């Protein structure tokens, strides 16, 4: 996993060049938006349990067969596994948002996820739906448009962070499908 700083150093080193110009400007911007980024990550991790349980509940409401005998969320053990997977995905999305880099998400969460779900017989459309619900929740928290819970954020526009976190959830959905 490379954070924004490591990425700039590695790229400059590969070119045998000093860090400068647009790379320095990008780092200045990253630092300037640091408090907003930390607030965005905090809004996700502070609401993680609710986000995951709401996403799984929404997925089940749309597909009640999941909790019927033979369904993938039938029995407490399977439901717990579903909730655990949602927590893991959300945790790695928050890591990626904190670092400003998707490599930790790709390497430690998404690599082999589809194959694992296929082997376990997990319905991909339901998993993708739960991920899309978490995406909507994360964007709402970051843009402070969640109706039930408002978070305090550093001053400024957070739409770029909302777009960034949405792209991480899109990567998860693409990896599962």
UniProtKB/Swiss-Prot annotation:
A matching Pfam family: Phycobilisome
Q: Name one GO cellular component term.
A: phycobilisome
Q: Specify the protein's topology with respect to the membrane.
A: Peripheral membrane protein
Q: How is this chain modified after translation?
A: Contains two covalently linked phycoerythrobilin chromophores and one covalently linked phycourobilin chromophore.
Localization terms from the record:
Plastid, Chloroplast thylakoid membrane
Q: Does the keyword Aminoacyl-tRNA synthetase apply?
A: no
Detail which positions bind (2R,3E)-phycoerythrobilin 2.
158
Query: GO biological process annotations for this chain's record?
Result: photosynthesis
- Modified-residue entries (N4-methylasparagine), positions: 72
Q: Which domain of life is it from?
A: Eukaryota
Q: Which InterPro entries match?
A: Globin-like_sf, Phycobilisome_asu/bsu, Phycobilisome_asu/bsu_sf
Binding-site residues for phycourobilin, renumbered to this chain: 50, 61
Keywords per UniProt: Antenna complex, Bile pigment, Chloroplast, Chromophore, Electron transport, Membrane, Methylation, Photosynthesis, Phycobilisome, Plastid, Thylakoid, Transport
**Residues binding (2R,3E)-phycoerythrobilin 1, per UniProt:** 82
| Family named by the database record | Belongs to the phycobiliprotein family.
Q: How does it assemble?
A: Heteromer of 6 alpha, 6 beta and one gamma chain.
Task: Sum up the protein's function in the record's words.
Answer: Light-harvesting photosynthetic bile pigment-protein from the phycobiliprotein complex.
Protein name according to UniProt:
B-phycoerythrin beta chain
**Organism for this UniProt entry:** Porphyridium purpureum
Question: Gene behind this chain?
Answer: cpeB
């Amino acid at each position: 996993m490379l954070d924004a700083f490591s990425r700039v150093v590695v790229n400059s080193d590969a070119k045998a060049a000093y860090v400068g110009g647009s790379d320095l400007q990008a780092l200045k911007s990253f630092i300037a938006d640091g408090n907003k980024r930390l607030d965005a990550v905090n809004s996700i991790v502070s609401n993680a349990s609710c986000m995951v349980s709401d996403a799984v509940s929404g997925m089940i409401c749309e597909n009640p067969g999941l909790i019927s005998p033979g369904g993938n969320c039938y029995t407490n053990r399977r439901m717990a596994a579903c909730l655990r997977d949602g927590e893991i995905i959300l945790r790695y999305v928050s890591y990626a948002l904190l670092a400003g880099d998707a490599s930790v998400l790709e390497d430690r969460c998404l690599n082999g996820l589809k194959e694992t779900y296929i082997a376990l017989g997990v319905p991909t459309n339901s998993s993708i739906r739960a991920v899309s619900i978490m995406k909507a929740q994360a964007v709402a928290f970051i843009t402070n448009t969640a109706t039930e819970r408002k978070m305090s954020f550093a001053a400024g526009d957070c739409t770029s962070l909302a777009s960034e976190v949405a792209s991480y959830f899109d990567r998860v959905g693409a990896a599962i499908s």
